Design a protein with these regions (language model features):
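Non-catalytic terminal/interface segments that mediate subunit docking, oligomerization
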Residues: 315-456, 534-545, 549-552, 557-560, ...
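A short glycine/serine-rich beta->alpha loop
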Residues: 4, 21-30, 58-66, 109-120, ...
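A short, small-residue-rich loop immediately preceding and capping a beta-strand
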Residues: 25, 61-62, 112-115, 143-163, ...
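Glycine-rich phosphate/pyrophosphate-binding loops
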Residues: 51-52, 133-143, 425-442, 457, ...
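Cofactor-binding active-site loop characterized by glycine-rich and histidine/acidic residues
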Residues: 36-176, 390-391, 419, 423, ...
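Terminal amphipathic helices with adjacent charged low-complexity linkers/tails
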Residues: 58-59, 243-340
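Thiamine diphosphate
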Residues: 95-107, 125, 131, 135-139, ...
Length: 667
């Protein structure tokens, strides 16, 4: 394929928009956009199936800029190809409430598929997107009707390659043979510190071959668009393996003084350098944010091509609807974001008396729900028997079984988190992943990205306290409740018993407005009698009265397994003539959203004698118990001993709660 002057002009325009945006903001990363402009041009205008007129088209190819610092490259492409990204938006780069923040933030209506920036997150998301496409294709495609057949394209950099999460996600992608995933690796040999040889000398091509990937290497300077197009076309046709294209590029390509230097990575090039670059290409060095008319006209043809592609798909789907009406209806329901079932009809109800670990209750709930929820996937980071996450009759999602709904993530917690986020942004699927709560630390970045972006990801964390017992302090979470609650937009559920667990699942599945974490016990907890005490349905309000007291003397507030501690303490206090009201607080975030009248009905403001009980650190509790309240919990790491002994030795007992209440009441 011959490179035309118009091709060159388009590529130059992409480069110059990117560096002008960074320069105007006096902040940003100009180097990678300059080096990767040819690859972006070829992919977006010739190879990627997308419709700028309808960015949410369900069968579009997905583009993920895993190296999110190169955001001006993405924004420039969105503008030039006709998305809702005006030239003024590029001029507003990195400014307050602009469409163009420093790193891309999830906005599918703008064409931004995922939030990226922390390196490696995007590549992990892309693996999840590829899993979603494979599963959806297995469910809905029929002979002659490939209604789901999109690809996932990723631009990743040297930093992405160094992050551990990239190794986790890439390893699993190779194992699963995700041949719908294509990564273009910007091999520019530069990081913030300097040349990559300072710390990164491995053979990435051989590494990815070992992962089970198809590897294509393009040497040179990153400007051979014919070679790039050929490589991507080959990758699109390749079967059985994901593909990585190792593209040798030069950071800040065309900059006389800063090409191939670390200075070009994360700082503006400077007005003088930009003038030199533009003049060397025959441009007016004084003009900024300039798009030649012929470039504008040519690149906007992408929009026309996208509309034609979608119209072709629409015609196919119309025929599909006639040939397979039931499947088409299911597809449309899924695309609307609805479950399509009444959860109240199938949720299990648990009778008292009895006891059950909430992780086992969660497993029972999944066994009831999953046969009726074919668009929910799940898995575990190699803790399936402990997490109770594999439902009866489940098939594993594997290379030769894309219809499987259970994902074996392996010991890859961080990778699991990023992959879950990728599945959950598909728009049609929900996905959960599980590990021990103490290992949520390994995946914190992915939980944070889900919360920032409001992905409806579901994180199951079992073994949630010193109730872990004999495994000891290495596996007993202490500060994790507080750490998760500190993340904005994350709903943290810690149910008190089996029925609260079922109601937590109901709320999570019915709400797609953001992520949720559900924290579950290893040890058995008593089932609260629904006929005698407060109803578990009130989990949807975040907190509720379990044991009601008229004109209470004190309040006992608790979460999870400690609600039963509070209830036993209440009985002991009643025997001494002290009226205690017990409050279960399974989700603080939901409780905070209730109106004042409801909050005051649960926590009467006139009752200041309050005891908080939770097998974690005190942080955050004084919002509920007040400055004079007493907290019963953990102030140190745990210990290796049976769970019952741990609770006794650390003083999380009914007797200690009684003692605290009496102290507050001066009795």
């Amino acid at each position: 394929m011959e490179v035309t002057k118009l091709d060159e002009l388009c590529i130059q325009t992409i480069r110059f928009l990117a560096i002008d945006g960074v320069q105007k903001a006096n902040s940003g990363h100009p180097g990678m956009p300059m080096g990767m402009a040819p690859a972006a041009y070829v992919l977006w205008t010739r190879l990627m199936k997308h419709n700028p007129a309808n960015p949410r088209w369900v069968n579009r190819d997905r583009f993920v800029l895993s190296a999110g610092h190169a955001s001006m490259l993405l924004y420039s492409m969105l503008h030039l190809t006709g998305y809702d990204m005006a030239l003024d938006d590029l001029k507003n780069f990195r400014q307050w409430k602009s469409k163009t923040p420093g790193h891309p933030e999830y906005d599918p209506q703008l064409g931004i598929e995922v939030t990226t920036g922390p390196l490696g997150q995007g590549l992990g998301n892309a693996v999840g997107m590829a899993i979603a496409e494979k599963y959806l294709a297995s469910q809905f495609n029929r002979e002659g009707f490939p209604i789901v057949d999109y690809k996932i394209f990723v631009f990743a950099g040297d930093g992405c390659m160094q992050e551990g999460v990239t190794s986790e996600a890439s390893s699993l992608a190779g194992h699963l043979g995700l041949d719908n995933l294509i990564v273009v690796y910007d091999d520019n040999h530069i990081t913030i510190d300097g040349k990559t040889e300072l710390s990164f000398t491995e053979d990435t091509a051989r590494r990815y071959k070992a992962y089970g990937w198809n590897v294509i290497v393009i040497d040179g300077d990153g400007n051979d668009i014919a070679a790039i197009e050929k490589a991507i076309q080959k990758a699109k046709r390749y079967k059985g393996k994901p593909t990585i294209i190792k593209l040798r590029t030069h950071i800040a390509y065309g900059s006389p003084n800063k090409q191939d230097t670390a200075d070009a990575h994360g700082s503006p090039l400077g007005t003088d350098e930009i003038k030199l670059i533009k003049q060397n290409y025959g441009w007016d060095g004084e003009k900024t944010f300039y798009v030649p008319d012929e470039v504008k006209e040519y690149m906007l043809r992408t929009k026309d091509a996208g509309q034609k592609a979608q119209k072709k798909w629409d015609r196919l789907f119309k025929k599909y609807s006639q040939a397979h009406p039931q499947l088409a209806e299911q597809f449309n329901v899924a695309a609307s974001g609805k479950l399509g079932i009444n959860l109240d009809e199938i949720l299990p109800k648990f009778k008292a008396p009895g006891a059950m670990a909430t992780r086992k209750a969660s497993g029972t709930v999944l066994n009831a729900l999953m046969p009726r929820c074919p668009l929910v996937l799940g898995g575990s980071a190699d803790l399936t028997p402990s997490n109770n996450t594999r439902f009866e009759g489940a098939k594993d999602f594997q290379k030769d079984c894309p219809e499987g709904r259970y994902i074996r993530f392996g010991v890859r917690e961080h990778g699991m988190g990023t992959i879950l986020n990728g599945i959950n942004v598909s728009g049609l699927l929900r996905a959960y992943g599980a590990t021990f709560l103490v290992f949520s630390d390994y995946m914190k970045a992915s939980i944070r990205m889900a919360s920032l972006s409001k992905y409806p990801s579901i994180f199951i964390f079992t073994h949630d306290s010193i109730g872990v017992g004999e495994d000891g302090p290495t596996h007993q979470p202490i500060g994790h409740f507080a750490a998760l609650r500190s993340i904005p937009n994350l709903l943290v559920f810690r149910p008190a018993d089996a029925n609260e667990t079922a109601q937590a699942w109901k709320f999570i599945l019915e709400n797609r407005n953001g992520p949720a974490a559900i924290l579950l016990t290893r040890q058995d907890v008593e089932i609260i009698d629904q006929e005698k005490y407060g109803k578990a349905e009130n989990v949807s309000k975040g907190a509720y009265v379990v044991v009601k007291a008229d004109n209470p003397d004190c309040l006992l507030l608790a979460t999870g397994s400690e609600v039963s501690v509070a209830m036993k303490a209440c009985e002991k206090l009643a025997a001494e003539g002290i009226r205690a009201q017990v409050v279960s607080m399974p989700c603080w975030e939901l409780f905070e959203k209730q109106d004042k009248s409801y909050i005051d009905s649960v926590l009467p403001p006139q009752v200041t004698a309050r005891v908080g009980i939770e097998a974690g650190v005190e942080l955050g509790w004084h919002k509920w118990i007040g400055s004079k309240g007493i907290f019963i919990g953990m102030s140190s790491f745990g210990a290796s001993a049976p769970a019952k002994v741990c609770f006794e030795k650390f003083g999380i007992t009914p007797d200690k709660a009684v003692e605290a209440a009496k102290k507050l009441l001066n009795k």
